[in-house]
């Protein structure tokens, strides 16, 4: 669905600004330092300074980069450090025309910010509105229209999920998981793992190593297990399109084949076997592995048609 690695449903490409990872979907979406316009734009940034968030469409902002905090939009509007499940708004604007009546968010120092129209004389705020608009987006976990599970023990973990189920686990390191329209499972135990899944099921497991896995799947199950064992190259790029492909460009080291090459044995001169052992009684095609004691410097030797 696109050109190159990490392109979703169009000509969008990933751009890295510092530790930020930016993915644009659904058409020719242009992004500049987190400015993503043209509907359905998903911007995943970690530790990146951004001028603006995502505008003009269903926007999802994920990580510690854009909009000065962890923000999540599940509707049309702009976010600036707050999370709203529904119609969102800019909590820092001074223009009442851009505000929505009865919109409630949580500000600093446990303050409630109530945005109303300037011509409204009275407002009724319910506790349900408060809880609906409460900022429950922590640790870079963002979910649009689906289930998203994000676990981060010791490191940075950014999980973005749109229209599907995304499971992201990061124990010790940096893990970036972006999932659009499908199921994505990303686990990173010790190292850096980058998992990208567009329109399909992707399973990425990275244990003990710096492994970059870029997986663009079209209705294909790809199982990519990368570590520091049985691999020649620590970087694996797995791209599947409408087929069953497992461990693309991954070279497994086969079990070694043991080949024993015996050292050459010099034949002794003047060795005579005992009289009770007559080699002439055996056929020529029989292998002689019987011991015989020869007069070869008083040593016991093996007999194979000749004394050695």
Swiss-Prot record:
One of its GO terms (cellular component) is extracellular region. CDD domains: KAZAL_FS. Component of the acid-insoluble organic matrix of the calcified shell. Gene3D superfamilies: 3.30.60.30. It is found in: Secreted. The keyword Secreted applies. The keyword Secreted applies. Residues 47-99 have a biased composition (Low complexity). This is Insoluble matrix shell protein 4. It comes from Ruditapes philippinarum.
């Amino acid at each position: 669905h696109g050109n190159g690695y990490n392109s979703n449903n169009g000509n969008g490409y990933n751009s890295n600004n510092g530790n930020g990872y930016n993915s644009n979907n659904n058409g020719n979406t242009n992004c500049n330092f987190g400015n993503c316009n043209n509907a359905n734009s998903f911007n995943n940034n970690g530790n990146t300074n951004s001028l603006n968030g995502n505008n003009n469409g269903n926007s999802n902002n994920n990580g510690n980069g854009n909009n000065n905090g962890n923000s999540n939009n599940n509707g049309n509007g702009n976010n600036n450090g707050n999370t709203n499940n529904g119609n969102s708004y800019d909590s820092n604007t001074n223009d009442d025309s851009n505000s929505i009546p009865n919109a409630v968010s949580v500000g600093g120092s446990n303050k409630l910010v109530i945005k109303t129209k300037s011509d409204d004389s009275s407002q009724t705020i319910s506790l349900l509105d408060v809880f609906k608009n409460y900022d429950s987006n922590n640790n870079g976990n963002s979910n649009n229209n689906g289930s998203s599970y994000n676990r981060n023990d010791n490191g940075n973990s950014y999980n973005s999920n749109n229209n599907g189920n995304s499971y992201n686990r990061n124990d010790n390191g940096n893990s970036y998981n972006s999932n659009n329209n499908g199921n994505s499972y990303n686990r990173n135990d010790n190292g850096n793992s980058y998992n990208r899944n567009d329109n399909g099921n992707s399973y990425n497991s990275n244990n003990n190593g710096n492994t970059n896995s870029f997986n663009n799947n079209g209705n294909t199950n790809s199982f990519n297990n990368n570590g520091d064992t049985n691999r020649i190259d620590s970087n694996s790029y797995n791209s599947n399109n409408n087929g069953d492909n497992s461990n693309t460009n991954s070279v497994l080291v086969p079990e070694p084949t043991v080949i024993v090459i015996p050292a050459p044995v010099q034949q002794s001169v003047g060795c005579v076997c005992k009289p009770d052992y007559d080699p002439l009684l055996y056929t020529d095609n029989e292998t002689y592995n019987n011991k015989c004691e020869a007069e070869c410097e008083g040593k016991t030797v093996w007999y194979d048609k000749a004394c050695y």
